[in-house]
Amino acid sequence: MSFDVLTINPGSTSTKLAVYQGDKVLFEETVRHTMQEFADFNNVQEQFDFRWQVLRRVIDAFGYDVNNLDAVVGRGGLLRPVAGGTYMVTEKMLADLKTNKYGEHASNLGAMLAKKLADTLDIPSFIVDPVVVDEMLPIARFSGNELIARKSIFHALNHKAAGRKIAKKLGSDYEKLNFVIAHLGGGISVAAHRQGKAVDVNNALDGDGPFSPERSGSLPMNDFLEACFSGKWNKRELHDLIIGRGGMISYLGTNSMLEVEAKVKAGDEKAIQAFDAMAYQVSKEIGACSTVLHGKIDAIILTGGLARSDLFTSKIIEQTNWIASVIIEPGEDELEALNSGVQRVLAGLEKEKLY
């Protein structure tokens, strides 16, 4: 039996919507937003009514009768750490999102929009595998200093969706296999997945692991401390240097890997070195995760937008295919992943969780 599910993914520059009937897409739309549209909003929460109007306008334009919906699902926002799975949207969850208790991001609006529409139809609303999924082993939380614990912040939705897809292709279940999965995008996260749980992963947002097109990843601590107290930058500027303007931007002035690849193919020596270094660091992180799984790995999976680059993935494959076979599952279809999580719950294949 299949179910009609509306999926909502609010991003910093877009609102993505789709209605699925089972795994069939009835319609899908991406509405791009300009900075001018958000100019009068002081924070993400103030965008709620604007995003709600976008949602209603798109649904009306496609002529879809919302009374046919069985559930609504939104992209999970910044919440307290939770295990992976599909979560019912509750008042407790909404309270944390509305106050930005654990951080502010456009994805915080996902559950709020889903809940508002679902309540008018008397149907359930959900989120699936938010970025705060935390299944790390206790030993993996040690950073090397008691003041600071390692955190799990990664591309959980796409990691787990890719894991499920590849497990199915291998004739098994995600919960029965071991994978090292690398999401390659604006941020890069590499995780050891042991029988359905991401037991260790780099913090892809706050400075841990490989550098990416726009993030610095791990940095030598003493040198960074010198920069912090040099008087050249304030806290906000340093934050931007490591998260928004780090990585490839800091080396080559661009976060477009298409531009970087073009420079590499044109023989630009600096671009070649930076490109190779990023692939090297991803490969090294994959190797580290393989030790977490004691070398018992069913496959290494490369996913995310950068997994479409044959040049980039070939360098990773060359360094890691001795560990396990490398499978490429390019791109990230967040709407499909959101739908799949809810379809499993509605079909009784998986039980929803409470926040």
Swiss-Prot record:
It is found in: Cytoplasm. PROSITE patterns: ACETATE_KINASE_1, ACETATE_KINASE_2. Its main location: cytoplasm. GO terms for molecular function: acetate kinase activity; ATP binding; butyrate kinase activity. GO terms for cellular component: cytoplasm. InterPro entries: Aliphatic_acid_kin_short-chain, Aliphatic_acid_kinase_CS, ATPase_NBD, Butyrate_kin. HAMAP family: Butyrate_kinase. Signal peptide: none annotated. Its EC number is 2.7.2.7. It catalyses: butanoate + ATP = butanoyl phosphate + ADP. Pfam families: Acetate_kinase. The lineage of its organism: Bacteria, Bacillati, Bacillota, Bacilli, Bacillales. SUPFAM superfamilies: Actin-like ATPase domain. This is Probable butyrate kinase. The keyword Cytoplasm applies. Belongs to the acetokinase family. GO terms for biological process: acetate metabolic process. It comes from the Bacteria. Keywords: ATP-binding, Cytoplasm, Kinase, Nucleotide-binding, Transferase. It is an enzyme of class 2 (transferase). The gene is buk.
